Amino acid sequence: GTLLVAWWQREAPFVAWQMLVIDAQAYALTLLVNDLTKWASGRARPWVRNGDCATNRDSPSCGGGGRNLSFYSGHAAVTATSAGLLCAHHTQLSLYQNDYLDTGTCVLAVLGTAVTGAMRIASDNHWASDVLVGHLMGYASGYLLPTLLYYKEFRAAPHEHRDSLEYAALPLVGDGVLGVTLMGLF
């Protein structure tokens, strides 16, 4: 929908193309990180521990390759990515040129992902923590990443001259190394 609004209503096909590339990048990141995390963690789904599988591992409902792919919820991550992208595009570009409609679109998208998460928990497919982490990861790749990378309001403007030292502590992970490194700008 937002691509069509940018393309036809706003008559900005290049903006629509840029949004499509941003969306593809966000979804690719979401799916890649989600799949890697699911396979690395191997967390059992609630129905494996609480349902028929808890007492009878040979039950037909215990079959399938997704038994230990609970963490974190891909449905929550993808819907949160969608909501994040909608919010980023609508709040940064004012696609409808109406603050109420653009904000309303964002709110409805966030409500939609919340309902999806609640349904994943209620259906015994995910633990609440699976859904919470899925939402956080989805919003990070759908809203935070595009906003920081592509929308100038969140990017720090370059400084001609720094009056003070700015520094940050960053994690340091390497082959046999785990620690913290200090990075500074002056």
Over which residues does each language-model region extend?
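Transmembrane helix-loop-helix
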Residues: 9-13
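Long, hydrophobic/aromatic-enriched structural stretches that serve as scaffold segments
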Residues: 1-8
